[in-house]
């Protein structure tokens, strides 16, 4: 978005293909996003190294492995109902691309536009299904998937986490808590623990559970402040990549117990809501959101939109 232990069965985040390796001798190449006024949001990658990017206009862009251009791949149409996108997640294990869809925030909403999660075939881009959030304030933000195929979806405005089991026809409420208002990124560690961040509270938290039920949050003590945390993506073990939109940077988040060490790995970005990695190469989106909200910039040309590539330490 611009601007606690989970016990029981072991959960594995089906996301961010890290199977493709990149040697340190290779210079990371930025990727240009085709089009104007794209304003990308989330970014994800599959095991083959293909990269997928969401946008405020509802188009999903794809850059094939090794390409320096991301092209429109899934466009809004009457069948898929795409309007404006936040989180996207490549789920290799189940052959699904997940996408958080919302009514446009920079103009009137089309009739019937709702917040919810949509699924597409990861290989072909064919639309599969839509799962709308219940009525009320809502903003679908990001997704993580368990080893059994159950998806967990964050709702920033409503302070909720929904789940969707394989074969289900509608979302189930996993958690609702005033403390969850502002929830943004979601990811699992190597041992199946669920972590989230909160874009409004500037926190990283562990989700606690009593059996199958949500049991609250543990706010981690951070080694330094963070500013508007957004995407949260697993690397390995208890290490994550985190994008900070207002902070204009990407960091490592290394968790040990109730503490987390924050280490900057890429700075100087232009409002960076999304991050993924392919092997040792990180990729971050630049949303350039000032061109959406600043009256002095709204009619100005934001220039090209670039996915920034950088070597991970």
Regions found by a protein language model. Name each.
Residues 27-33, 69-79, 126-133, 170-177, ...:
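A short beta-strand motif characteristic of beta-propeller blades
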Residues 34-50, 79-101, 133-151, 177-194, ...:
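Beta-rich, blade/repeat-based domains predominating
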Residues 51-57, 91, 97-112, 145, ...:
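Conserved beta-strand positions in repeat-built beta-propeller and related beta-rich domains
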Residues 59-61, 115-118, 160-163, 203-205, ...:
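A short loop-to-beta-strand structural motif that recurs across blades of beta-propeller domains
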Residues 64-68, 121-126, 165-169, 208-213, ...:
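Short loop/turn segments that connect beta-strands within beta-propeller blades
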Residues 111-148:
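Asp-box/WD-like beta-propeller blade repeats and closely related beta-sheet repeat scaffolds
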Residues 276-313:
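Blade-level signature of beta-propeller repeat domains, shared across WD40, Kelch, NHL, RCC1
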